[in-house]
Amino acid sequence: MKDLDKLRNDLDMCDEIIVDALRMRYQIIQEVTNYKQENGIEIVQPEEEERKKKFVLDKLGDYKYKKSVLKVYESILYRSKRIQSHELFDFNIFLIGFMGVGKSTISKALQRTFAMDVVEMDEVIAKRNGMSISEIFELHGEEYFREEETKLLRESRNKKNIIVSCGGGV
């Protein structure tokens, strides 16, 4: 059996191969992004993502660590999608509507689709104030809460590639 130093050296070589492969993959992703931009092709192509996942599943077969490899691969796909969305989709998405119409549900779907960060305004305001929204209303009043919403909206103008799920009163 190999000694521990030799095994660690083998792992280092594997890591080097992984890093080189990722660098090459992300370079190709940049080329795909450029091609999509030049030719007006949609950012999201779910059929291509499914084809890639099927390829990996077929390649892994009944491999003992299949679930772990799939998790890593899903992360690679997510990061690849994020690179594309940041290049091709250079703005924010604001979801506005009454309470309970599904802004949070839609923001999660958009997050999966475009690999963008989500800002749930009510959650951010509650966290910043260390209390629930109803407690903020009770303690500080609606005017204070609306000022907090406005402040957060202004802050979001300075960010790119985010999905903002606005509170029901925006």
How would you name each of these model-derived features?
Residues 95:
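Hydrophobic anchor at the beta1->P-loop junction of P-loop NTPases
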Residues 104:
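Walker A/P-loop
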Residues 120-170:
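ATP-dependent small-molecule kinase phosphotransfer cores
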Residues 1-91:
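Domain-level signature for soluble enzymes in the chorismate/prephenate branch of the shikimate pathway
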Residues 98:
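P-loop (Walker A) phosphate-binding loop of NTP-binding proteins
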Residues 101:
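ATP-binding Walker
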